[in-house]
Structure formats: C-alpha cells, structure tokens
C-alpha cells in the first residue's frame, strides 16, 4: 500500500473495494502478530521486529452519504451492508493492528452509524450542538453546555477532562 489513497467518490463499489483491501491488510497484520509468541498488537510488533508496519488512517467525512440506504437503489443495499460489515470489523480490531478510523457525520444516530461501529470508536468530539445531538455523540450534554452558540470551530471531547479545543482554520488559498 502506498502512503496516501484519496477516494473522493460516491461510487459505492470503489468504497467497498478500498475498505476490503484495508480490512485484508488488518487481517494480515493480525495473522503476522499471532505468528510471533507474545506479540499482540502493532506497537509490540514494531518494537521487536525490524519490518515495521506504518499506521493506516481511514478518514471518511459525511459517513451518512455512504451508509444511508435511502439515498441508493435497492440493488446497492447489499454493497452498503458489506461496507458496514468492513467498517465494523475495522472498528473492532483495527486499532490493535494500526488501522484507525476517523469518521465524520452530522448526526451519528443508530440509523446512520450502527452500534457495532459507534461502540468501538473510543474518541469522539462534537462541535456546538443542541442537547439531544450532544447526547447522541458524547453520551452527555457537554457540547450544548460548554460551547457558546456563537463560537466557531470549537469542539469538546468525550474525555474525562471535557477538553475543549479550537480546530485549525484553513481558507481556500491555504488549501491549494
């Protein structure tokens, strides 16, 4: 695998193919770690073996655009189920083997993000949100309580310290 793959497509077949490749990479790493006594994760593997694995970060913005079956014809629903399955397995086992998910969505309720995926996402952050949305994302109301309504770019984390941070702003000129 190369250093960076950019998939900017609503083509479910492309998304499914790439996620299957990444899932297979995760399984290969798991198999390699299991082959060595006492090696249970990528950090241990990289410490004791010279062939180090790089971490893989999967970033999906607007997850609902991929997983919402109402947006696609019935013929695509099996493909969406496959994508959900791949993401669920990666969410469950990927971190130990250096495959990480960063998922973005406007409203991560059960209709958009299945419980198996949501339950295995350990770090969550939320921008200013009303009480119900904050409950869905962070399991409490801190996004409605800690972030002023007029604040732009502020987020609160699900850590015990209730960390609030400001996202870095890039304008269009800086993105070129």
Question: Could you say what each language-model-derived stretch is?
Answer:
Residues 1-39, 53-132, 136-139, 144-148, ...:
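P-loop NTPase catalytic phosphate-binding loop
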Residues 42-43, 167:
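Short, low-complexity intrinsically disordered segments
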Residues 43-54:
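Short amphipathic alpha-helices and their capping/turn segments at secondary-structure boundaries
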Residues 146-176:
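Conserved AAA+ ATPase small/helical "lid" subdomain
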């Amino acid at each position: 695998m190369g250093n960076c793959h950019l998939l900017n497509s609503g083509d479910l077949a492309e998304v499914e193919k790439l996620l299957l490749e990444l899932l297979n990479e995760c399984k290969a790493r798991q198999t390699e770690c299991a082959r060595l006594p006492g090696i249970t994760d990528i950090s241990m593997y990289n410490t004791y073996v010279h062939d180090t694995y790089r971490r893989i970060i999967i970033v999906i913005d607007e997850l609902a655009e991929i997983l919402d079956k109402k947006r696609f014809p019935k013929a695509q629903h099996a493909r969406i189920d496959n994508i959900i399955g791949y993401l669920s397995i990666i969410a469950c086992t990927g971190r130990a083997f250096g495959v990480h998910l960063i998922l973005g969505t406007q409203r991560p309720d059960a209709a958009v993000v299945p419980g198996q995926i949501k339950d295995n996402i350990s770090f969550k952050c939320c921008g200013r949100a009303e009480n119900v949305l904050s409950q869905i994302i962070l399991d409490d109301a801190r996004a409605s309580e800690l972030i002023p309504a007029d604040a732009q770019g502020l987020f609160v984390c699900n850590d015990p310290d209730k960390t609030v941070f400001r996202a870095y702003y890039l304008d269009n000129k800086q993105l070129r």
